[in-house]
Every structure is written in structure tokens, then in C-alpha cells.
């Protein structure tokens, strides 16, 4: 149902006769006693022996969290400390000096671009933002004096990608030099693996406003020959094989930044002529950021335990670490963003629990009441709610109030109505899907997506992020953000998450009982096979990235920091769903990725 979704498990069997033990346990819900949860039972309204009508619930069969309270509290990174910080500051100063020297060198554009690319992929470019922008501006404003490099596919595609990533206009027409008289890419490029890889990565920076299909043909051409390269085998250049395979799985433009950093640190060490000081800088920075994240996770796990949501609502997923992963995907850097990450993780954890209330536990009547209460967002609305919903509702109210208090204190603006609207829109989308389920209705793909981009859950995360990272918050930008339709920079990233979620989880969810997803909607509407539907959804993802690229340039009212959060959540979603349901169900690849991000420091040898 959402980025936190698994399936609907509420099934209204009319002839089901439950065991007596299940009846007695369900009765506690109507009497207001603590919830005594019974797994693996279907929802049906029945009468107990005392005449009270009680809904029999069904479990999501969720596995316990992999990362419990005791484990999180025990985490510690031993590769941080005074001597590590001293070395890091030395390397950082040296890199700043090197970048400023490069700025004043008119030549060596390729070297400049390669260094900037490596700084980004190694996760340390945020330390050198000003220097990088100055260098790129100089490259953009003057033509290169390196004629041989300028004529290479590798250089041209790298330049195109790096400049576009940083908001500099550069026409795709510069790639026309690599086409023959028939308008096809030259066959002489087929063996230029480095150039093809850069061309492939550059092709994902296309926008919807570009009418030419040049970048699309570049993508097709590069992908085909990169696949041929992998099939041919290249035992001498194992690092290049890994780079190509990695890019074909998830392009760099669509990859969660922090995951890319951890992966690329290991790869970069094996690339010929790798800069050993840059490797050391990246490892030190990764460990410092990881230690900061560990401290935040310890604080969050204490909050989560004190909330008692996992204990009192055992049907819901206990996923505080996974929630934190979403947020570090949005904004990982700098201790000044700690409050933002803490609060957005709370928002994500709340959205997970609320999603499970709609997906797994609540009856349709209860969900109607719950939706109305969320639209009101006031304490007295709790009186209308079933007992098991009260704790969740109050936790939601407190979380929103904490964020609203901070913004009111700092900027004098009451944002509670805006936060309420985002939660109300989310709950209404959940309710719509519940109604579809109970009526057996399969919407068209367009109708499904109009609701599903909201029900995926990222809306509340991005709206809360806006208020936490934007200063000052102007009346103009508020009106734009909360107009009749949310801006594209919120809608399109949510669409990416919804579609990648559906691709990763749809088959299992439909087997276990759920509302139709985008795949099933397309299949029914077009009489298509599942394979054809999946191909269409992948095409939709590709086109949606063009919409995101366009929105990045069109939404000038928003600050750079917020724009980064909005785009990064799309990258995070695509990465989290790369190997399955990265939020709800963890296989080895997903567990290993989270462990490397938060719990396994990189070993560094210090004198």
C-alpha cells in the first residue's frame, strides 16, 4: 500500500467459524483492555458468548526486527577519535588547496571532471561544494583547450553528466559528434568501454522538455554494448567489470548516495592510478558520518522503546533502523541536520505503523473513524477511536507537534495545519485503497496511480522535510507547495517509489491477498501478461526520471537543500527496492547493506 506496505490481510469470509480461543482474545479490543494479539487469523465480525460483536484480526506475519534495542545501544565505531579527526582535517585542507590550484589552471579539464566525479561517488563532495561549483562554472563558461580529450566520448559524456548534475545547462547536441552520416552512433565506439559507460550514465540526465531522442538512442546503444562487454568477459580489468555490472543494475543518477559511497570506496582502491589520499579521506569521512548516525540511532531506539508502539501494537512492523535508512538516503551529511533526521525518522516510523493499521488490522468502519480523526488532528478526537488506535494517534500528534513547535520557535510560523493536511491526504489515500479492496474493485492504471503516488507514503516525509530544512519559509513558497496539487518535485519522486515498490513486492503480495498494484491494473486494462506489464512499469520509471530532472530546473522557489531531499528520496526508494522489499522483509543482500551503512566501520590503519 505504501513504501512501508506489504499487503492487505483483511479478508471478509462470510462462513468462517473461528476457534473459541481466538474469540476470547479478540474481545479485549472492545473492552478497552491492553491488546492481546492473536496471529494468523482472518478478519470477520462475529458474536462472542457475551453478545459483544468483536472483529477477528489477521496477522501480517512480520519477522521481528533484525536490529533490536540492545544491539543498537551497543554499537560503537572504534575508528573515530582525536587522531582520526586530526588526519581527516589535514587531508581535507590538502584537498581544498588542490581544488583551488586546479581552478586557476586553464587546462586539465578531464582531470578536474574525474576528480569531481570521484569526490561525489566517494561521498565527500559536500565538504568542497564552493570549490566544485567554481571549477564547473569555469568549465561551463569556456571551451576546453584539450582538443584530444574534447573529441573523446569518455570526456564529452563525463562533462555532460557532471555539468547537468550541478544545474549547468549543456545541450545534448554535443553528442552528435559521435554519430555517423546515417544518424547512428559510430560502430568504432563499440569497444570503448570507458566511454560507453559514461555515455550510459549521462543518458539518465535527459529531461521531458527535450524533443530529440538523442539521449534515448545513446542509452540503447551504450546498454547493448556494455552487456556485450560483460558477456565477453574481461579477466584483466575486474574493476571495470564491476563498474559496468553495477551501473546496469541501478544507474548512478538513480542510486542512493550513501549506498553508492560504501560500494565505491571498495572499488576505487582497485582502479589504476587511484589517489591514495582520496581513499583515506573517504574512509575517514565514512566512519565519522557512520558514528554520527549510530548516535542518532541510539537516540531513536530509546524513543521507539519508550513509545511502546511495537509492544502495544504487535501486528505492526518494528522497523526503526529501516526508517532511518530512508532518511539518511534523503540527507546523510552534517551534524547540523541531526534534528531533521531524528524527526523525519519518527515520521517514517509513524507512517509504517499507520500503514499497518490500514493494511492489516483495522476494519473498514474503524478506518473511516481513524481517517476522520487524522483530518482533525486534535487530542479530543482520540475519544472516538478504538482502544488500539489511541496510542498510535497520540504518538502521531506528539511527533507533529514537536516539529511544529521547533518551526514556530525559530521562524514564527504555525505549520500544524500544513502537517495535518499531508497526513490527512495520506490517510484518505489509504482509505481509498481499503474501499477498493472491500468492494473487489480494480482501478485503471491512471486511477490507481492518482491515488498510489500519495499512498506510497513519501508525501509526509517530504512535506515534513520541507519545514525542517527551509529557512526562511516564505508565504509564496507555502502557497505553491500547498496548492490544489502538490508540486511535481514531490509527486514524481513518490511515483518512482510507488512503481519500484510494486515491481519488488507485487507478486508475493498478490499471492497473500492485496489490492491490485500497478502491474495487475495494467494487465487487466490491456489484457497483458505480467512480463509485458513489468516492461511497461519499467518504462514508466524511466520516463518519470525525466520528469524529476525537469522539475529540478523548474521549481526555483524551493531551496537547494529541500530539492536535494526530494530527489534523494526517489534514489533511496529505487535502491531500497533493488533486491526486494527493503523496508519490510530482509534478505541477505538487504541486511548486509544496512549493516555496512550503520554498523560496520571501515578499518583504517593509523600510525
UniProtKB/Swiss-Prot annotation:
Reported cofactor(s)? Mg(2+); Mn(2+)
The UniProt annotation puts motif DDXXD motif at 355-359
Residue numbers binding Mg(2+) 2: 355, 359
CDD domains, alphabetized: Terpene_cyclase_plant_C1
For this protein, the Enzyme Commission number is 4.2.3.105, 4.2.3.117, 4.2.3.16, 4.2.3.15
Positions annotated to bind (2E)-geranyl diphosphate: 317, 355, 359, 498, 501
Source organism's superkingdom? Eukaryota
Q: What induces it?
A: Up-regulated by jasmonic acid treatment.
Tissue distribution of the protein = Expressed in stem trichomes, green fruits and roots.
Reaction catalysed by this enzyme: (2E)-geranyl diphosphate = tricyclene + diphosphate; (2E)-geranyl diphosphate = (1S,4R)-camphene + diphosphate; (2E)-geranyl diphosphate = beta-myrcene + diphosphate; (2E)-geranyl diphosphate = (4S)-limonene + diphosphate
Q: Where in the cell is it found?
A: Plastid, Chloroplast
- The organelle targeting sequence, given as a residue range: 1-28
Q: Does the keyword Lyase apply?
A: yes
Q: Which GO terms describe its biological process?
A: diterpenoid biosynthetic process
Q: Which family does it belong to?
A: Belongs to the terpene synthase family. Tpsb subfamily.
About its domains, the entry says: The Asp-Asp-Xaa-Xaa-Asp/Glu (DDXXD/E) motif is important for the catalytic activity, presumably through binding to Mg(2+).
Report the function annotation for this chain. Monoterpene synthase that catalyzes the formation of camphene and tricyclene from geranyl diphosphate. Also produces lower amounts of limonene and beta-myrcene, and traces of several other monoterpenoids.
Designated name of the protein: (-)-camphene/tricyclene synthase, chloroplastic
Species, as recorded: Solanum lycopersicum
| Chain's gene name | TPS3
Amino acid at each position: 500500500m505504501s513504501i512501508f506496505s506489504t499487503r492487505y490481510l483483511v479478508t471478509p469470509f462470510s462462513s468462517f467459524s473461528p476457534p473459541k480461543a481466538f474469540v476470547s482474545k479478540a474481545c479485549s479490543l472492545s473492552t478497552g483492555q491492553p491488546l492481546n494479539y492473536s496471529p494468523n487469523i482472518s478478519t470477520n465480525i462475529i458474536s462472542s458468548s457475551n453478545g459483544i460483536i468483536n472483529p477477528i484480526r489477521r496477522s501480517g506475519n512480520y519477522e521481528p526486527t533484525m536490529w533490536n534495542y540492545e544491539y543498537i545501544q551497543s554499537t560503537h565505531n572504534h575508528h573515530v577519535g582525536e587522531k582520526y579527526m586530526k588526519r581527516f582535517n589535514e587531508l581535507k585542507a590538502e584537498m581544498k588547496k588542490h581544488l583551488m590550484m586546479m581552478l586557476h589552471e586553464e587546462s586539465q579539464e578531464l582531470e578536474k571532471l574525474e576528480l569531481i566525479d570521484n569526490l561525489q561517488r566517494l561521498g565527500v563532495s559536500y565538504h568542497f561544494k564552493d570549490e566544485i561549483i567554481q571549477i564547473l562554472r569555469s568549465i561551463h563558461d569556456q571551451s576546453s583547450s584539450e582538443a584530444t580529450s574534447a573529441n573523446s566520448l569518455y570526456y564529452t559524456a563525463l562533462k555532460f553528466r557532471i555539468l547537468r548534475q550541478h544545474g549547468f545547462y549543456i545541450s545534448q547536441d554535443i553528442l552528435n559528434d559521435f554519430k555517423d552520416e546515417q544518424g547512428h552512433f559510430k560502430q568504432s565506439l563499440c569497444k570503448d568501454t570507458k566511454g560507453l559507460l559514461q555515455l550510459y550514465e549521462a543518458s539518465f540526465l535527459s529531461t521531458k522538455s527535450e524533443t530529440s531522442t538523442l539521449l534515448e538512442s545513446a542509452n540503447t546503444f551504450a546498454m547493448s554494448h556494455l552487456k556485450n562487454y560483460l558477456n565477453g568477459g574481461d579477466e584483466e580489468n575486474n574493476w571495470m567489470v564491476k563498474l559496468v555490472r553495477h551501473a546496469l543494475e541501478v544507474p548512478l543518477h538513480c542510486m542512493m548516495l550513501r549506498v553508492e559511497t560504501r560500494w565505491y570506496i571498495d572499488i576505487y582502491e582497485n582502479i589504476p592510478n587511484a589517489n591514495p589520499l582520496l581513499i583515506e579521506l573517504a574512509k575517514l569521512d565514512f566512519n565519522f558520518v557512520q558514528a554520527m548516525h549510530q548516535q542518532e540511532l541510539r537516540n531513536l531506539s530509546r524513543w521507539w522503546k519508550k513509545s511502546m508502539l511495537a509492544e502495544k501494537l504487535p501486528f505492526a512492523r518494528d522497523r526503526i533502523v529501516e526508517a532511518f535508512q530512508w532518511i539518511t538516503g534523503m540527507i546523510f551529511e552534517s551534524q547540523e541536520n541531526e534534528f531533521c533526521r531524528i524527526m523525519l525518522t519518527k515520521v517514517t516510523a509513524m507512517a509504517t505503523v499507520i500503514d499497518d493499521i490500514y493494511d492489516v488490522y483495522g476494519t473498514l468502519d474503524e478506518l473511516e473513524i481513524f481517517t476522520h480523526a487524522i483530518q482533525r488532528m486534535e487530542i479530543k478526537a482520540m475519544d472516538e477511536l478504538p482502544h488500539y488506535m489511541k496510542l498510535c494517534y497520540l504518538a502521531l500528534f506528539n511527533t507533529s507537534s514537536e516539529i511544529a513547535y521547533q518551526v514556530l520557535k525559530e521562524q514564527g510560523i504555525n505549520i500544524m495545519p500544513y502537517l495535518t493536511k499531508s497526513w490527512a491526504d495520506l490517510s484518505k489515500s489509504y482509505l481509498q485503497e481499503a474501499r477498493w479492496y472491500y468492494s473487489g474493485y480494480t482501478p485503471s492504471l491512471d486511477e490507481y496511480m492518482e491515488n498510489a503516488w500519495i499512498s506510497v507514503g513519501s508525501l509526509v516525509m517530504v512535506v515534513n522535510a520541507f519545514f525542517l530544512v527551509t529557512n526562511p519559509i516564505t508565504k509564496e513558497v507555502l502557497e505553491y507547495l500547498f496548492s490544489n496539487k502538490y508540486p511535481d518535485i514531490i509527486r514524481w519522486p513518490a511515483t518512482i517509489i510507488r512503481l519500484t515498490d510494486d515491481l519488488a513486492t507485487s507478486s508475493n503480495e498478490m499471492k497473500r491477498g492485496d489490492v491490485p498494484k500497478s502491474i495487475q491494473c495494467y494487465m487487466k486494462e490491456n489484457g497483458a501478461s505480467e512480463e509485458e506489464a513489468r516492461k511497461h512499469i519499467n518504462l514508466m520509471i524511466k520516463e518519470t526520471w525525466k520528469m524529476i530532472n525537469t522539475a529540478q530546473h523548474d521549481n526555483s522557489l524551493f531551496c537547494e537543500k529541500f530539492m536535494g531531499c526530494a530527489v534523494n528520496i526517489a534514489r533511496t526508494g529505487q535502491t531500497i527496492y533493488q533486491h526486494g522489499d527493503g523496508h519490510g522483509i530482509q534478505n541477505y543482500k538487504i541486511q548486509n547493506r544496512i549493516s555496512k551503512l550503520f554498523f560496520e566501520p571501515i578499518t583504517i590503519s593509523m600510525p
